């Protein structure tokens, strides 16, 4: 006691009494923590003050980590055309390791953008197109040959008349092809070939 400087008041003497008697709830004091600005209930003669203060300071640090993480996410997405509205979620967020597990969290929920299909458009290759164009005349000639054979069986004069009309229509089409190419452009396969117009139509021999 002699080492203490200054007069000793009765209130100071009561603080050094051994805690033998039962603790009275009326002796509950509120000590202010000037560092964090919080009020912590403590009991004189108890060692729970340090653990209580440590737990509250740890929880306060967790709150600060949560707020800093959310603000950093909003700053990253600012100016990118993303909605920065905080939407409350019922479930804890994935990055809530340093936050309370029994609190209410808000996390930025981005709008789901429609997924664009990057699959290439299926187009017909040039080889298959040429093959199909070459197969059309063969099919037409085969059908015409079958029709001509049936006409020959029915009568010679009818077959000759039908063949004459078909050949005249074909020659007329050959004359009109150059004009049609300028009005209606078609595939390069047809344009590369120079089509010479037929100047005179030779008369068909009558048998």
From Swiss-Prot:
GO terms for cellular component: virion component. Keywords: Virion. It is found in: Virion. InterPro entries: Corona_nucI, N2-like_embe-CoV. Pfam families: Corona_I (PF03187). The gene encoding this protein is included within the N gene (alternative ORF). Belongs to the coronavirus I protein family. Structural protein that is not essential for the viral replication either in tissue culture or in its natural host. This is Protein I. The lineage of its organism: Viruses, Riboviria, Orthornavirae, Pisuviricota, Pisoniviricetes. The gene is N.
């Amino acid at each position: 006691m002699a080492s203490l400087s200054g007069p000793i008041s009765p209130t100071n003497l009561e603080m050094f009494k051994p805690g033998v008697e039962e603790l009275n709830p009326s002796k509950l004091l509120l000590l202010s923590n000037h560092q964090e600005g919080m009020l912590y209930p403590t009991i004189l003669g108890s060692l729970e003050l340090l653990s209580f203060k440590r737990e509250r300071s740890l929880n306060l640090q967790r709150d600060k980590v949560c707020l800093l993480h959310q603000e950093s996410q909003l700053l990253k997405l600012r100016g990118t055309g993303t909605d920065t509205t905080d939407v409350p979620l019922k479930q804890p967020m994935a990055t809530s390791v340093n936050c309370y597990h029994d609190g209410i969290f808000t996390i930025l929920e981005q709008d789901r953008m429609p997924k664009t299909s990057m699959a290439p458009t299926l187009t017909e290759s040039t080889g298959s197109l040429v093959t199909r164009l070459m197969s059309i005349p063969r099919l037409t000639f085969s059908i015409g040959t079958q029709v001509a054979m049936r006409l020959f069986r029915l009568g010679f004069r009818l077959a000759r008349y039908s063949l004459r009309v078909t050949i005249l229509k074909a020659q007329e089409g050959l004359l009109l092809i150059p004009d049609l190419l300028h009005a209606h452009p078609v595939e390069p396969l047809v344009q590369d070939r120079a089509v010479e117009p037929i100047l005179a139509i030779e008369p068909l021999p009558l048998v």
